[in-house]
């Protein structure tokens, strides 16, 4: 049922959010996480492959690009991610999660496949850049649509650990990308090897598209957009699937019923004005988490090879082996301590991981300046730091995906993702200059101190502004805009502050 003037005025009464949140974990949820979570694996895969094949593309028997032209490949991919997040984020809130998580994956597949088909010579590097923009748009759109879908279909008590683990799988993709490029560049002729490396992602995406086709639309999105019959069909399908393995399902608390009036769509200008006017502390909190983690990650991730090469004299051919240890730390953090964000709580864990990673980076910076580290111990320090930082950074994505109303969730994710990427790109650019020719470690030392300060700032802000969202329904954290008589009704018209079920002190 699509919203009509009659339903818009009378509203729709529904228990669908409560029915989703009371479900036990089942094979359906595992299938959902695997099918949707591959987005982060693909992003890690793409970034790593692009970094590792870069030197090969300068050779005369490949594309014969200059070093600066190769460096621009990542820039164009990043630009694509930002525009993709904003464009597809808007469409996801308007057209639905399922439609978009099929489209965005297809866009990525096309872009990355075109990269592998880039002709050699002349001005074909423009074709290469264009294909990277397309691939980036697909992945950027994935961030907005997929985070929304996962949050809306995972039961409340599992949402934190699942979202953090899924975001952390970026590093599984980075690890896979390292192995792929080691094999492709060392065992296949260079002219073909880099192309084979770029085709691994599209092949994986093609398989996942068929899996995603069988997933239902988010019942939460459907009911909030007045599609009551479709929403009932989707939740019934999910409950039937869960019931096959879990037997009789827990009863639904009738007091959790919501009365909803579908709301009209809003643009990004109105969204930004509303977020920072009516949700100021939550907006500042979300932006701070995303900016600080993105700055540190881009600064370290895109320059680690230069640090190993210039300061520790590691040959480029051996750099990937150090990187695999770095990936392992980043992956294990979210997988092993992610559940604590649901049990100990968001505030303590987010502030704790940000503060601890900042403090550990200060210690590492002091050891680096004193010349007390070698390539192995430097990598071990990074691995320990990012064991905690990765969990915290993943929680940043979780935060911006759960603390704003459902009707604008994908657009809100897109906005904060775009802001973070813009600041993150400054980190890699700055650190590249600080490294210089590797003769003086003082400048990089202060760069590490700056990165540590950024993470500590994020931890302090989290301690004061975090939203205690653990175990709570999304509708209790931020009331949907269309809830009749609820605290979010008319937010874009009335000008009154709107919170949700969490106290203002927890992040208004």
Model-derived regions, located:
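Transmembrane-helix signature of 12-pass secondary carriers
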Residues: 1-508
């Amino acid at each position: 049922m699509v919203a009509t003037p009659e339903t818009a005025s009378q509203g729709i009464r529904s228990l669908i959010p409560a029915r989703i949140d009371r479900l036990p974990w089942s094979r359906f949820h595992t299938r959902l996480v695997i099918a949707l979570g591959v987005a982060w694996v693909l992003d890690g895969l793409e970034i790593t492959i692009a970094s590792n094949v870069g030197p090969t593309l300068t050779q005369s028997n490949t594309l014969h690009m200059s070093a600066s032209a190769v460096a621009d490949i990542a820039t164009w991919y990043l630009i694509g991610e930002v525009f993709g997040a904003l464009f597809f984020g808007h469409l996801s809130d308007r057209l639905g999660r399922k439609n978009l998580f099929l489209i965005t994956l297809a866009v990525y597949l096309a872009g990355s496949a075109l990269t592998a088909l880039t002709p050699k010579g002349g001005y074909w590097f423009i074709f290469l850049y264009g294909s990277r923009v397309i691939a980036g748009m697909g992945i950027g759109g994935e961030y907005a649509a997929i985070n929304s879908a996962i949050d809306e279909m995972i039961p409340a008590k599992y949402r934190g650990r699942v979202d953090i683990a899924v975001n952390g799988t970026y590093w599984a993709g980075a690890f896979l990308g390292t192995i792929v490029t080691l094999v492709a560049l060392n065992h296949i002729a260079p002219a073909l090897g880099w192309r084979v490396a770029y085709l691994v992602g599209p092949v994986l995406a093609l398989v996942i598209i068929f899996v995603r086709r069988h997933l239902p639309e988010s019942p939460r999105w459907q009911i909030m957009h007045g599609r009551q019959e479709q929403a009932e069909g989707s939740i019934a399908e999910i409950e039937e699937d869960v019931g096959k393995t879990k037997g009789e399902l827990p009863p639904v608390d009738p007091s959790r019923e919501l009365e909803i009036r579908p709301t009209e769509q809003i643009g990004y200008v109105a969204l930004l004005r509303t977020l920072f006017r009516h949700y100021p502390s939550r907006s500042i909190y979300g932006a701070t988490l995303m900016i600080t983690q993105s700055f540190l990650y881009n600064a370290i991730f895109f320059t680690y090879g230069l640090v190993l090469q210039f300061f520790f004299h590691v040959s480029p051919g051996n750099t990937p082996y150090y990187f695999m240890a770095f990936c392992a730390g980043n992956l294990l953090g979210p997988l092993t301590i992610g559940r604590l964000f649901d049990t100990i709580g968001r505030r303590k864990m987010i502030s704790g991981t940000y503060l601890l990673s900042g403090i550990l980076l200060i210690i590492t910076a002091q050891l680096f300046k004193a010349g007390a580290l070698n390539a192995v111990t430097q990598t071990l320090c990074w691995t320990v730091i990012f064991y905690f930082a990765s969990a915290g950074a993943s929680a940043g994505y979780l935060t911006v995906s759960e603390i704003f109303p459902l009707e604008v969730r994908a657009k809100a994710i897109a906005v904060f993702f775009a802001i973070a990427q813009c600041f993150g790109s400054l980190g890699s650019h700055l650190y590249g200059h600080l490294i210089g020719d590797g003769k003086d470690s003082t400048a990089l030392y202060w760069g590490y101190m700056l990165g540590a300060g950024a993470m500590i700032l994020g931890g302090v802000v989290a301690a004061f502004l975090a939203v205690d969202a653990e175990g709570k329904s999304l509708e209790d954290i931020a009331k949907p805009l269309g809830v009749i008589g609820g605290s979010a009704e008319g937010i874009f018209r009335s000008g009154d502050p709107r919170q949700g079920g969490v106290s203002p002190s927890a992040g208004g």
